[in-house]
Amino acid sequence: MKVRNSLRSLKNKPGAQVVRRRGKVYVINKKEPRFKARQG
């Protein structure tokens, strides 16, 4: 899991989902788990 300032490039990857949990924004990607990230 990476912490990124901007998730814009990650959310364009195939299989990416943008999820809000507890006020934080996450990108989860089942196809490519290395693209998991959190913003903030």
From Swiss-Prot:
Claim: Iron-sulfur is one of the keywords in the record: no
Protein name: Large ribosomal subunit protein bL36
Species for this entry: Corynebacterium glutamicum (strain ATCC 13032 / DSM 20300 / JCM 1318 / BCRC 11384 / CCUG 27702 / LMG 3730 / NBRC 12168 / NCIMB 10025 / NRRL B-2784 / 534)
One Gene Ontology term from the biological process aspect of the record: translation
GO annotation, cellular component aspect: ribonucleoprotein complex; ribosome
InterPro entries: Ribosomal_bL36, Ribosomal_bL36_sp, Ribosomal_L36_bact
UniProt record similarity statement: Belongs to the bacterial ribosomal protein bL36 family.
Keyword line: Ribonucleoprotein, Ribosomal protein
MF terms in GO: structural constituent of ribosome
